[in-house]
Amino acid sequence: MGKRIQLVLNQDVYKLGRNGDLVEVAPGYARNYLLPKAMAYVATPGVLKQAERRREQERQRQLELKQAAEKQKQVLEGVGTLTIAMPVGEKEALFGSVTAQDVADLIQSATGQEIDRRTLTLPEVRKLGTYTAEIKLHTEVTAAVKITVVAE
């Protein structure tokens, strides 16, 4: 196998790596594709230090986001069971259903914390009872909140 060149990627490159990754590629691939399209630049000692510093800053930022999500999880799970009143028909069947937006509004009124409805995972709620809503706060942090549906 011939000589290979070390490059730092400027952007995500399919089947090669992500932005900021240090990769080794064939000289022709670097010279004819990656470098002319500004997808990567040659890895000099200064560039390697800068890329490492950037990776460390990103790691620190992710750690701070995870810690903030852990705190938010403690607040949400410390609330206990939230109650929502819905109009009911025969056999305890609801008129309509409880939506993720309803739960997000309920959580905001109870805790003061704004929750995006797209982060909520809610089972289908069409009858009275207690349900568990899961809130994805971070890629590694999920909070569970109990919701009780009662007759209006």
UniProtKB/Swiss-Prot annotation:
Domain of life of the organism encoding this protein: Bacteria
GO cellular component: ribonucleoprotein complex; ribosome
GO MF annotation: an example: rRNA binding
Keyword tags: Ribonucleoprotein, Ribosomal protein, RNA-binding, rRNA-binding
Pfam families, sorted: Ribosomal_L9_C, Ribosomal_L9_N
Coiled coil: none
Gene Ontology biological-process annotations: translation
Record-linked InterPro entries: Ribosomal_bL9, Ribosomal_bL9/RNase_H1_N, Ribosomal_bL9_bac/chp, Ribosomal_bL9_C, Ribosomal_bL9_C_sf, Ribosomal_bL9_N, Ribosomal_bL9_N_sf
Keyword DNA repair attributed: no
Protein family (similarity comment): Belongs to the bacterial ribosomal protein bL9 family.
Record's protein name: Large ribosomal subunit protein bL9
